[in-house]
Amino acid sequence: DVDFNTWQHDNVRATHQPGSTFKLFVYATAMKQGWLPSDARLKDDYIQMNVVDENGKPSVWRPHNANGRFSGANIPLRAAFAQSINTIAVKLGQEVGIPNVIKTAQDMGIKSKLNDAPSLPLGASDVHLMELVGAYASVANYGEYVKPTMITRIVDREGKVVYEARKEVRTVLSDKEAFYMQTLLGAGMTDAGGTSQALASQNYIGQWFWNRRIDAGGKTGTSNSHADAWFVGVTPNLVGGAWVGGEYRQIHFRSGALGQGSKTALPIFGLFMKKVLSDASLAPKYLARYRIPEGVNPADLEGRFVYQSADTTRHDSSSVDLSEGIGEAPREEHGDNTPPPPAAAPHEPTAPKEPVNNTLNGTAEPVKDQSPKTGMNKNSATIKTDRTQSSGEKKPKKKTSGDDLFN
């Protein structure tokens, strides 16, 4: 047991680098600006940006993908999100505007300080688990953010209510925008290369998911130097998140594979959901499908591309030590992986002619395919997304089936 008088670290509310779980806010901002899951305007190629660190030292940032390669193809947003392709997330952040990404994240419940930096889409600013899960719950709630509540009310021995939590509800996405994000989260489970595919296995919720008894999705995240592993899972009536890591940034997993959200954090949510859905008293409440808002064109939800399956690159989400060589993947993991020169061979496109000037807070981290073993902290948070539970009024939902759009 830990003595609270000497150790008061709250792992649920302690801030950590969220890795690729932060991409939710980049893509949600894009949906708000009229982008669609099927949009393939952005190319997965070599990019570099002129940046300055917190001390004002100029440098060049070269974000990498997990496999150290670039496909050279225009990637649909659905595939880019499902496969957690970093180059697309960084470019999308520049397209929609980092200040707008920050505004979306704040509207969706992120109160931690977010830095206006090109690396923010990769999770450069620390957040805590509870606010992240609360933000993801607004996607399941069709765009309505409901502030997470630990204690809803207190009743004394006579049955008198002595305390009742104030309900905080606000609309942050339209029905259609939220549905697009539900689709992107689900693609991580169903599409080739999706980083959340394991959740759909029989080890977790596969028996219900593939029988179309529940819709589900999620996003993995892995931070700088494999210090933090994340997974946030979303279902229509229950959202949960797991973080695995150490109390201090100096504590990290022995390898990138051990620190991957898909290997270390996803199983926590998966086993939790399996227990819930296996319970005869709980299953009727949480076995649910999404409704399809009016005006959704099924073609707008498509956009598959077979590319990669890892969810992280060398410095996926944190402040970097410029002395380490920004954005260069370790040679022992991917061979000679120095960024390609401007005159690149086919499938290794050239760098942009005019690098973007901005402030640097991070890049990304490659991974090794190893089985996870860790003795680090494992923390999780869950939020019921049923509006009846949180706000006293249930948002009307049409009973349209999602069979043709999800599984």
Please describe what each predicted stretch is.
Residues 1-16, 20-24, 37-40, 99-105, ...:
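Periplasmic/cell-envelope proteins involved in peptidoglycan metabolism and beta-lactam response
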Residues 1-17, 22, 36, 79, ...:
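A penicillin-recognizing enzyme superfamily signal
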Residues 2-5, 31, 109-114:
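Proteins synthesized as precursors that undergo proteolytic processing into mature forms
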Residues 28:
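Extracellular glycan-interaction surfaces
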Residues 36-101, 145, 157-186:
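Conserved catalytic neighborhood of penicillin-recognizing serine enzymes
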Residues 39-40, 45, 118-120, 149-152:
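Extracytoplasmic/periplasmic beta-strand context in beta-sandwich domains
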Residues 55-65, 96-134, 150:
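Mid-domain, small-residue-enriched loop/turn segments at the edges of structured enzyme/sensor domains
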Residues 295-407:
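Low-complexity, Gly/Ser/Thr/Pro-rich intrinsically disordered linker/tail segments
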